[in-house]
Amino acid sequence: LIKDILTVASRAPSGNNIQPWKVYVVTGQKREELIHQVCQAQIELFNHPELAHNYQETFKYYPEQWTSPFIERRRENGWGLYGLVDIQKGDQKKMQMQHLRNYQLFDAPVGLFFTLNKTLETGSKMDISMMIQNVMIAAKARGLDTCPQAAWNPFYRIIFDILNIPDDEELVCAIALGYADMTQIV
Protein backbone atom coordinates (compact mmCIF):
# COMPACT_ATOMS: atom_id res chain seq x y z
CA LEU A 1 0.00 0.00 0.00
CA ILE A 2 2.80 2.44 0.89
CA LYS A 3 4.68 1.60 -2.29
CA ASP A 4 1.52 2.20 -4.30
CA ILE A 5 0.96 5.58 -2.63
CA LEU A 6 4.55 6.67 -3.28
CA THR A 7 4.46 5.45 -6.88
CA VAL A 8 1.31 7.42 -7.64
CA ALA A 9 2.56 10.49 -5.75
CA SER A 10 5.91 10.48 -7.55
CA ARG A 11 4.11 11.40 -10.77
CA ALA A 12 3.93 14.97 -9.46
CA PRO A 13 5.16 17.66 -11.82
CA SER A 14 8.60 19.14 -11.33
CA GLY A 15 10.75 21.72 -13.09
CA ASN A 16 12.54 20.09 -16.04
CA ASN A 17 10.85 16.88 -14.89
CA ILE A 18 13.80 16.09 -12.59
CA GLN A 19 11.58 14.77 -9.78
CA PRO A 20 14.20 15.72 -7.19
CA TRP A 21 12.72 14.08 -4.11
CA LYS A 22 13.67 11.11 -2.02
CA VAL A 23 11.39 9.49 0.54
CA TYR A 24 12.60 7.36 3.45
CA VAL A 25 9.95 5.03 4.88
CA VAL A 26 10.36 4.22 8.57
CA THR A 27 8.53 1.44 10.41
CA GLY A 28 9.16 -1.12 13.13
CA GLN A 29 12.39 -1.06 15.12
CA LYS A 30 13.91 1.82 13.11
CA ARG A 31 10.81 3.87 13.87
CA GLU A 32 11.13 3.08 17.58
CA GLU A 33 14.83 3.98 17.62
CA LEU A 34 14.18 7.24 15.79
CA ILE A 35 11.32 8.21 18.09
CA HIS A 36 13.37 7.40 21.18
CA GLN A 37 16.42 9.40 20.14
CA VAL A 38 14.53 12.45 18.87
CA CYS A 39 12.28 12.51 21.96
CA GLN A 40 15.38 12.35 24.16
CA ALA A 41 16.88 15.29 22.24
CA GLN A 42 13.65 17.29 22.56
CA ILE A 43 13.49 16.61 26.32
CA GLU A 44 17.11 17.77 26.57
CA LEU A 45 16.08 20.99 24.81
CA PHE A 46 13.14 21.48 27.17
CA ASN A 47 15.53 21.24 30.11
CA HIS A 48 18.45 23.10 28.49
CA PRO A 49 17.18 25.64 25.93
CA GLU A 50 20.71 27.01 25.61
CA LEU A 51 21.51 23.89 23.53
CA ALA A 52 19.14 24.96 20.74
CA HIS A 53 22.10 25.85 18.53
CA ASN A 54 22.79 22.10 18.28
CA TYR A 55 19.40 21.53 16.66
CA GLN A 56 18.89 23.90 13.75
CA GLU A 57 17.12 23.07 10.51
CA THR A 58 19.06 23.49 7.28
CA PHE A 59 16.59 26.10 5.99
CA LYS A 60 14.18 28.46 7.69
CA TYR A 61 10.68 27.03 7.54
CA TYR A 62 9.07 29.81 9.56
CA PRO A 63 9.89 33.52 9.64
CA GLU A 64 12.12 34.83 12.40
CA GLN A 65 9.65 37.66 12.99
CA TRP A 66 5.95 36.85 12.68
CA THR A 67 3.75 39.61 11.26
CA SER A 68 0.04 40.20 10.84
CA PRO A 69 -2.13 38.42 9.79
CA PHE A 70 0.06 35.31 10.23
CA ILE A 71 0.84 35.80 13.93
CA GLU A 72 -2.89 36.01 14.71
CA ARG A 73 -3.63 32.88 12.71
CA ARG A 74 -0.80 31.03 14.43
CA ARG A 75 -2.01 32.07 17.89
CA GLU A 76 -5.62 31.19 17.12
CA ASN A 77 -4.56 27.74 15.94
CA GLY A 78 -2.35 27.19 19.02
CA TRP A 79 -4.99 28.35 21.46
CA GLY A 80 -7.59 26.19 19.72
CA LEU A 81 -5.40 23.09 19.87
CA TYR A 82 -4.33 23.58 23.47
CA GLY A 83 -7.90 24.37 24.48
CA LEU A 84 -9.13 21.09 23.00
CA VAL A 85 -6.57 19.10 24.98
CA ASP A 86 -7.09 21.16 28.15
CA ILE A 87 -3.69 22.84 28.27
CA GLN A 88 -3.81 26.21 29.96
CA LYS A 89 -1.52 29.07 28.95
CA GLY A 90 1.73 28.74 30.89
CA ASP A 91 1.37 25.01 31.66
CA GLN A 92 4.84 24.15 30.39
CA LYS A 93 4.72 20.49 31.40
CA LYS A 94 1.52 19.72 29.49
CA MET A 95 2.72 21.79 26.52
CA GLN A 96 5.96 19.81 26.42
CA MET A 97 4.10 16.51 26.57
CA GLN A 98 1.83 17.58 23.71
CA HIS A 99 4.84 18.78 21.71
CA LEU A 100 6.50 15.37 22.14
CA ARG A 101 3.54 13.80 20.33
CA ASN A 102 5.06 15.19 17.10
CA TYR A 103 8.16 13.08 17.64
CA GLN A 104 6.08 10.00 18.37
CA LEU A 105 4.48 10.41 14.93
CA PHE A 106 1.18 10.78 16.81
CA ASP A 107 1.30 6.97 17.21
CA ALA A 108 1.18 6.40 13.44
CA PRO A 109 2.98 3.18 12.48
CA VAL A 110 4.77 4.75 9.51
CA GLY A 111 6.99 7.80 9.21
CA LEU A 112 7.86 9.24 5.81
CA PHE A 113 10.89 11.54 5.63
CA PHE A 114 11.23 13.71 2.52
CA THR A 115 14.60 15.01 1.37
CA LEU A 116 16.16 16.98 -1.48
CA ASN A 117 19.73 17.34 -2.61
CA LYS A 118 21.25 20.43 -0.91
CA THR A 119 22.39 21.92 -4.22
CA LEU A 120 18.81 22.41 -5.40
CA GLU A 121 17.02 25.71 -5.01
CA THR A 122 13.57 27.04 -4.08
CA GLY A 123 11.93 25.62 -7.21
CA SER A 124 12.72 22.10 -6.07
CA LYS A 125 11.09 22.81 -2.69
CA MET A 126 7.98 23.79 -4.64
CA ASP A 127 8.27 20.55 -6.64
CA ILE A 128 8.59 18.33 -3.57
CA SER A 129 5.63 20.17 -2.01
CA MET A 130 3.43 19.00 -4.88
CA MET A 131 4.70 15.46 -4.42
CA ILE A 132 4.03 15.61 -0.67
CA GLN A 133 0.48 16.79 -1.31
CA ASN A 134 0.05 13.90 -3.75
CA VAL A 135 1.16 11.50 -0.99
CA MET A 136 -1.47 12.92 1.34
CA ILE A 137 -4.24 12.75 -1.27
CA ALA A 138 -3.25 9.24 -2.41
CA ALA A 139 -3.15 8.04 1.21
CA LYS A 140 -6.60 9.49 1.93
CA ALA A 141 -7.99 7.87 -1.23
CA ARG A 142 -6.78 4.54 0.16
CA GLY A 143 -8.31 5.06 3.61
CA LEU A 144 -5.16 6.26 5.39
CA ASP A 145 -4.58 9.52 7.20
CA THR A 146 -1.55 11.78 7.27
CA CYS A 147 -0.03 14.56 9.32
CA PRO A 148 2.72 16.62 7.66
CA GLN A 149 5.36 17.75 10.14
CA ALA A 150 8.15 20.30 9.94
CA ALA A 151 8.79 19.75 13.67
CA TRP A 152 11.33 17.02 12.84
CA ASN A 153 13.59 19.34 10.79
CA PRO A 154 15.84 20.59 13.64
CA PHE A 155 16.70 16.96 14.41
CA TYR A 156 17.85 16.10 10.90
CA ARG A 157 21.31 15.00 12.11
CA ILE A 158 19.78 12.30 14.32
CA ILE A 159 17.42 11.25 11.52
CA PHE A 160 20.20 11.13 8.92
CA ASP A 161 22.39 9.06 11.22
CA ILE A 162 19.71 6.48 12.01
CA LEU A 163 18.41 6.25 8.43
CA ASN A 164 21.83 6.47 6.75
CA ILE A 165 20.82 9.51 4.71
CA PRO A 166 23.76 11.09 2.85
CA ASP A 167 25.04 14.49 3.99
CA ASP A 168 24.34 16.02 0.57
CA GLU A 169 20.60 15.87 1.27
CA GLU A 170 18.41 18.12 3.41
CA LEU A 171 15.25 17.21 5.26
CA VAL A 172 12.17 19.02 3.96
CA CYS A 173 9.56 17.48 6.27
CA ALA A 174 8.12 14.28 7.68
CA ILE A 175 4.67 12.77 7.42
CA ALA A 176 3.01 10.53 10.00
CA LEU A 177 1.01 7.90 8.09
CA GLY A 178 -1.62 5.57 9.50
CA TYR A 179 -5.26 5.32 10.49
CA ALA A 180 -6.65 8.23 12.48
CA ASP A 181 -7.86 7.37 15.97
CA MET A 182 -11.29 8.99 15.85
CA THR A 183 -11.69 8.57 19.61
CA GLN A 184 -8.99 11.21 20.16
CA ILE A 185 -9.88 14.89 20.22
CA VAL A 186 -6.83 15.80 18.13
What are these regions (language model features)?
Residues 1-186:
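Acidic, surface-exposed loops and disordered segments
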